[in-house]
Swiss-Prot record:
GO terms for biological process: autophagy; protein targeting to vacuole; vesicle-mediated transport. Keywords: Autophagy, Endosome, Membrane, Protein transport, Transport, Vacuole. InterPro entries: FUZ/MON1/HPS1_longin_1, FUZ/MON1/HPS1_longin_2, FUZ/MON1/HPS1_longin_3, Mon1. It comes from Kluyveromyces lactis (strain ATCC 8585 / CBS 2359 / DSM 70799 / NBRC 1267 / NRRL Y-1140 / WM37). Its main location: membrane. In complex with CCZ1, is required for multiple vacuole delivery pathways including the cytoplasm to vacuole transport (Cvt), autophagy, pexophagy and endocytosis. The MON1-CCZ1 complex acts at the fusion of vesicles with the vacuole, through its regulation of the SNARE complex during the coordinated priming and docking stages of fusion, and particularly at the stage of tethering/docking. It is found in: Endosome, Multivesicular body membrane; Prevacuolar compartment membrane; Vacuole membrane. The keyword Transcription regulation does not apply. The keyword Chloroplast does not apply. Belongs to the MON1/SAND family. This is Vacuolar fusion protein MON1. One of its GO terms (cellular component) is fungal-type vacuole membrane.
Length: 528
């Protein structure tokens, strides 16, 4: 079953919060990266090369596979890739330092390109404009991946290449049996595990449209099946939009593998919870039991307001991220007074079957998302949404939901930006959406405390980075604090504080967030 919406909706664009912090001074001049481990007090400093475009890093997560290739395969890759992409395969060292790479890509173009192809090497999707070149590259990569599977019986995760200018390009892979995914990446701040997680998100989107069961049937029936032309135009459009966002405007929820909630007063959130609960109970009494599996209420920018779910089931974060992307991509051009109805397969929930989603924008600028297992449940779900809409209109508490919290800069003048993640609920809070440059700093902080599989090295750890800028006297400091209960990322700009003072500010911030948790997060939602 392929996604083909029956109805359409639209809404006005909502302004997304932005930050006024200017970090460009720290990115344009030659500098060095200082790593400090607060727990141990050790400090390491690496000076950048004389190239003003380079900013040094102290660690490298690249995994080079070229030493395992035989001479013929090396020759094939080098000659063929040079005709497609001006790079040479490094055959001398497998741990070349990331110091020779650009810390932040200043060329203005995308530093990531995503590719999807079948187990037979047939191209499904590419961000390259020249499809012939993309097909040639995927054919080569298909050969390389098969080489490792046959000779080493191991899945290839990544290989690294270096251009004549010393810039590193990584090719990271994810093998999903019938589907192979690859990302060509020119940055050094995302680890292999993080890039593979992005590939898994792309794969989850494909499964959301096709389902694993249907994909298996198609590929087993004909191994060289053309999946590219099986996907609808809408599928291709949404897949392109997702990959473009991953490459140029990555979302904070992807970075933190979490969901973001709308800050609001507990009274307003409880009012919406009560409406969902009473309406659902009314439907059960009316013999509609089992028709409604999940109900989500979000803001127009996909921040969670409330959720209705079974007491023994929760939807995986990645499944919800895919659902939000499908809705987000169609939100701008659709009509407000109509609804969207489409099938969707949640890979992490049940990758063999479809659920059915009804989406509607309500007058108070919230989005209702109702999910059912029944293909013919549209009328029932539509009536369910109508009743909720009527109750929200009658209840003034359900208007003007977002709560404007205090000015964080006044309470914490040294903190320019932060991200707080509550692990139990897999939800995050940030006072404003980080810029791409900020996310790159956060990636560097996170990588210090994770292994090559993306797992935290310790149950509890605190790490600090300081980026020195020779053009100005200040330092840009970053703190990453991870425990079993939370993760905290902080950026502090142009200050010269001691580690103890910075850590004290972090503790005060955590204490304040815990005092207002009921405003920031959904603790449980409505269960049945």
């Amino acid at each position: 079953m392929r996604r083909s919406p029956s109805f359409q909706i639209s809404t006005k664009n909502s302004a997304k919060p932005t930050t006024s912090i200017d970090l460009t001074n720290h990115l344009s001049a030659r500098g060095g990266l200082f790593y400090q481990d607060i727990d141990t007090g050790t400090t390491a400093s690496i000076k950048a090369k004389n190239d003003p475009n380079l900013l040094a890093a102290t660690y490298d997560h690249s995994i080079s596979a070229d030493t395992d290739l035989n001479i013929d395969l090396q020759s094939l890759i080098t000659s063929e890739l040079n005709s497609l992409y001006p790079l040479t395969l490094n055959q001398e060292t497998s741990n070349k330092s990331a110091n020779t790479t650009k810390f932040i890509d200043e060329r203005g173009g995308k530093d990531k390109h995503f590719f999807v192809f079948t187990s037979a090497g047939k191209l499904v999707f590419s961000q390259w404009e020249n499809e012939n070149h993309a097909m040639g590259l995927t054919g080569i990569i298909h050969t390389v991946m098969n080489y490792f599977n046959i000779n080493d019986n191991t899945a290839m995760r990544q290989f690294t290449m270096y251009g004549k200018d010393g810039i590193m390009t990584r090719f990271v892979f994810l093998d999903k049996n019938h589907i192979k995914l690859m990302v060509q990446c020119n940055n050094n701040y995302e680890s292999t595990a993080q890039l593979q997680q992005q590939l898994d998100l792309v794969y989850s989107y494909i499964i959301s449209s096709v389902s694993q069961r249907n994909l298996n049937k198609l590929m087993l029936k004909r191994s060289n099946f053309d999946l590219q032309h099986y996907l609808t135009d809408l599928d291709q459009q949404l897949l392109k939009s997702l990959c473009e966002s991953l490459a140029t405007q990555p979302k904070l929820t992807w970075f933190a593998n979490s969901l973001e909630c709308l800050p609001m007063s507990p009274k307003k959130r409880n009012a919406i919870n009560s409406i969902l609960s009473t309406t659902y109970l009314d439907f059960n009494i009316s013999n509609h039991n089992g028709q409604i599996l999940y109900t989500l209420v979000t803001s127009l920018d996909m921040r969670l307001i409330s959720i209705l779910r079974p007491s023994n089931h929760t939807l995986h974060t990645m499944d919800l991220q895919i659902l939000f992307e499908v809705v987000r991509a169609q939100l701008t051009d659709l009509l407000l007074d109509k609804v969207l109805w489409f099938p969707i397969c949640f890979q992490k929930f049940n990758d063999n079957g479809f659920l059915y989603a009804l989406i509607k924008v309500l007058p108070n600028n919230t989005i209702m998302m109702v999910i059912s297992s029944q293909k013919n449940a549209f009328d029932i779900l539509n009536e369910f949404v109508r009743r909720i809409e009527d109750k929200m209109i009658d209840d003034n508490t359900c208007n003007n939901l977002e709560l404007q919290l205090l000015d964080w800069h006044k309470k914490f003048p040294y903190i320019n930006h932060f991200i707080y993640k509550m692990k139990r609920t897999v939800q995050i809070y940030t006072p404003s959406q980080p810029t791409n440059e900020m996310l790159q700093f956060y990636y560097h902080l996170k990588n210090l405390c994770e292994d090559d599989k993306g797992t935290n090295l310790n149950k509890s750890s605190v790490a600090m980075l300081k980026w020195k800028n020779d053009a100005t006297p200040g330092l840009l400091s970053g703190v990453y604090w991870a425990t079993e209960k939370f993760e905290l990322y902080i950026l502090l700009n142009d200050i010269n504080l001691s580690n103890q003072s910075i850590l004290k500010s972090a503790k005060l911030l955590i204490q304040h967030i815990r005092e207002i948790e009921s405003y920031l997060f959904i603790s449980r939602g409505v269960t049945f």
